[in-house]
Amino acid sequence: NGKTWSKTQPLNDGKEFGAIQPVVLNYGNGKLQLLSRTENELVTQNWSSDYGITWSKMTATSLPNPNSGIDGVSLKDGRQLLVYNPTGKNWGDRVPLSLALSNDGTNWKRVLDLEPLRENTDKEGEEYSYPTMIQAPDGKVHIVYTWNRKTVKYIVLDPQKLN
């Protein structure tokens, strides 16, 4: 009805970046970061400093992405956690499935492979995709994702143990 929400202009033109399925990270005091998967072999970002009323131009991050789903959460300790496939070929491998941490949304460090690339295996059909995650009131992070397009996997971890 527009009484409790408003719509902004498109955040990209679809030409420079083919971006879809965004994730919003909250840094507090109105500062938001939008991360998107793309067909451009990387994750893109937009920033807002006014609670999402206006947004910066979409730009590339240093995070590789094979046009696969990502998810992120703003942790209670102020860090940002991202789950993603860190490969860069468009429609490329969706393995490994990894976690990256950032203090500022600009500098990301890959800290854990939830599903690593295994030695001596045929990668055909090996896929870990469409992740989603939350941080529960107890501080633990709960992650679910599609496993080999056959089932769903679930992981719980303590983000304080991630460096």
Say what each PLM segment does.
Residues 1-163:
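Asp-box/BNR beta-propeller blade signature and adjacent active/binding-site loops
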